[in-house]
Amino acid sequence: MSIFSARLASSVARNLPKAANQVACKAAYPAASLAARKLHVASTQRSAEISNILEERILGVAPKADLEETGRVLSIGDGIARVYGLNNIQADEMVEFSSGLKGMALNLEPDNVGVVVFGNDKLIKQGDIVKRTGAIVDVPVGDELLGRVVDALGNAIDGKGAINTKDRFRVGIKAPGIIPRVSVREPMQTGIKAVDSLVPIGRGQRELIIGDRQTGKTALAIDTIINQKRFNEAQDESKKLYCIYVAIGQKRSTVAQIVKRLTDSGAMGYSVIVSATASDAAPLQYLAPYSGCAMGEYFRDKGKHALIIYDDLSKQAVAYRQMSLLLRRPPGREAYPGDVFYLHSRLLERAAKMSPAMGGGSLTALPVIETQAGDVSAYIPTNVISITDGQIFLETELFYKGIRPAINVGLSVSRVGSAAQTKAMKQVAGSMKLELAQYREVAAFAQFGSDLDAATQQLLNRGVRLTELLKQGQYVPMAIEDQVAVIYCGVRGHLDKMDPAKITKFEKEFLQHIKTSEQALLDTIAKDGAISEASDAKLKDIVAKFMSTFQG
């Protein structure tokens, strides 16, 4: 009998009268013993059930340890946070502050980490916890971005809701090597006569647009985007060109105007705008070009074609200088850090024409640089000129003379684009660059002497008329076949006796005439990409007939 049973029996016996005590004890012991045994069996069964339930629960738990590496803010100011404790962090890794703000680790020092803050640093204070994300800075990429305006981190800022993309690309991807590339061979038509004829651009090229403020740099870039509408409306994917416009350090009102212009022109459907305006933090202005480039690389790596415009890289360099000086990196020429060349070279080298084995896609870059008083020998302009495959140089003097686009044909050059220029344009524009160069040379001396020989006078006449012919309004890009027809009139001498003031009117009426009555010829030039002998004779005949009826 167990101790429990004995105690139960004695308890029952104590409560009975003394006379019946002995009898009761004898009767109570067996009953108490039986009750105790039943209780013991029941408790043992319940214990077994509980053990089984606990065992099932323990086995069902996934062995997951939620470890986070955190640090604390030592100091914060001017968009730079010094953080202690993140010993295993990677360079360019994204971190998250307790306020929800994001940042990027740029300086990895023995006792602290220099973090640039993507936003308003007033939301961060000393002692705040900083958490590693384990991810290098990346942005959303994909077709879902087309038609949207995003910030440097790929977040929608156009009020049209969140963007749900399937893929994300790192912003700092290494540029393609030599083997995956091929030489530039397909034309990237801007729709601007002066560019497509004299400084042609190919798909996969880097062509710099450089000039002082208010000389039409952005207008040139926007016209190029608008001109792609004629290709993007067609079904042929190989002809389509997706456009990314990166606005760095510009006014918000300017970006809003660009969005409106592209929307009104029907160009927003194949474009993405990445905006890091002057009111955004310097780290966002530094990051925006890389983010836009990653979005363009998505199309390039899918075998498609993309165009990216960086407007402008001078402001990115200024933002990078600000960050570097605040991070206590040693300054160099013009107070820029020593790696400012690498800042732009690693960005622009990502523009490439890929080989057929790599999908045959391309990413064309049009970086913009703003000069001060026409000084192209400054640090940043010379850096970017040496990285790119040519430059379009815009001059204030030409702009105020009414020559718009204000392209200085002598200083502008395309180092690889001529290989991509259509044969038809080569046929008509081949002699034009030489004639314009000779005209500029002679024009300087012509103002000193009145008695010029006939050949020199002829050169001056032709140069004045060709310069007039290359003028073009904003937001009216031209198809390549229209450009060929107009330039043909100038280089073949049909306009030599015309009053230069009437050339703009002539161009408008001539194009109207040829489109209404001779559209088949334009279609043939566009399809063949060249002017055959038959087309040449027909075009000559059309021009002669029109000239006889043109009133001016």
UniProtKB/Swiss-Prot annotation:
Repeat as a keyword?
no
Q: Where in the cell is it found?
A: Mitochondrion inner membrane
Task: List, in alphabetical order, the Gene Ontology terms for molecular function in this entry.
Answer: ADP binding; ATP binding; proton-transporting ATP synthase activity, rotational mechanism
The organelle transit peptide extends over 1-47
In which domain of life is the source organism classified? Eukaryota
Tell me which UniProt keywords the record has, alphabetically.
Answer: ATP synthesis, ATP-binding, CF(1), Hydrogen ion transport, Ion transport, Membrane, Mitochondrion, Mitochondrion inner membrane, Nucleotide-binding, Transit peptide, Transport
Tell me the protein family, please.
Belongs to the ATPase alpha/beta chains family.
How is this protein named in the record? ATP synthase subunit alpha, mitochondrial
**Native species of this protein?**
Drosophila melanogaster (Fruit fly)
